[in-house]
């Protein structure tokens, strides 16, 4: 499975691509897309959309793992991050790539074993899991952490989705015939 992790932000949008499964994850790519604060908002959003669309087309991930947006204390920051989040959703929908959201505590627990882990512990586990010596950007590190989290959770999510679909089909009378 190929997963693109995304740490959404308007000034800095982290991207990290991994492939494999939870036991054998391989690092393929990471980058932090940066927009200039002097750019007008439409230009910033257009740049993020164009770059993300290009990367989705080039790398063709099976899924996107994005940081679930938590309530932020500063309304202006929340608004800007929300706009970047919307651009990510649009680009993924256009590319036909499913999005899975994970909260910060869920990512920390998945990688370190505790939801109270600090940033350095998460970065250490990302580097150790992927065999990376240097990660120069926290946003890209967060994106890789999100991708690894999805690799760990994907098998369980797929099973849950199949069971839910079977339950819906049974309730509506559309259950497949058993032979």
From Swiss-Prot:
Residues reported in the UniProt entry to bind Mn(2+) 2: 67
GO cellular component: cytoplasm; Holliday junction resolvase complex
Effect of loss of the gene: Only heterozygous strains can be obtained, suggesting this gene is essential.
Motif DNA-binding loop per record, residues: 68-74
Protein residues bound to Mn(2+) 1: 7, 139
Residue ranges the record marks as coiled coil: none
Main location: cytoplasm
MF terms (GO), sorted A to Z: crossover junction DNA endonuclease activity; DNA binding; magnesium ion binding
Keywords on record: Cytoplasm, DNA damage, DNA recombination, DNA repair, DNA-binding, Endonuclease, Hydrolase, Magnesium, Metal-binding, Nuclease
Record field: catalytic activity: Endonucleolytic cleavage at a junction such as a reciprocal single-stranded crossover between two homologous DNA duplexes (Holliday junction)
Subcellular location: Cytoplasm
Cofactor, how bound (note): In vitro only Mn(2+) supports endonuclease activity; Mg(2+) inhibits binding to HJ DNA. Another study shows Mn(2+) is the preferred cofactor but Mg(2+) does support cleavage. Binds 2 Mn(2+) ion per subunit.
Enzyme Commission identifier(s): 3.1.21.10
CDD domains the record matches: RuvC (cd16962)
Key word DNA repair present: yes
InterPro entries: RNaseH-like_sf, RNaseH_sf, X-over_junc_endoDNase_RuvC
Additional record remark: D.radiodurans metalloenzymes exhibit a strong preference for Mn(2+) rather than Mg(2+).
Family named by the database record: Belongs to the RuvC family.
Protein name: Crossover junction endodeoxyribonuclease RuvC
Species, as recorded: Deinococcus radiodurans (strain ATCC 13939 / DSM 20539 / JCM 16871 / CCUG 27074 / LMG 4051 / NBRC 15346 / NCIMB 9279 / VKM B-1422 / R1)
Gene this chain is encoded by: ruvC
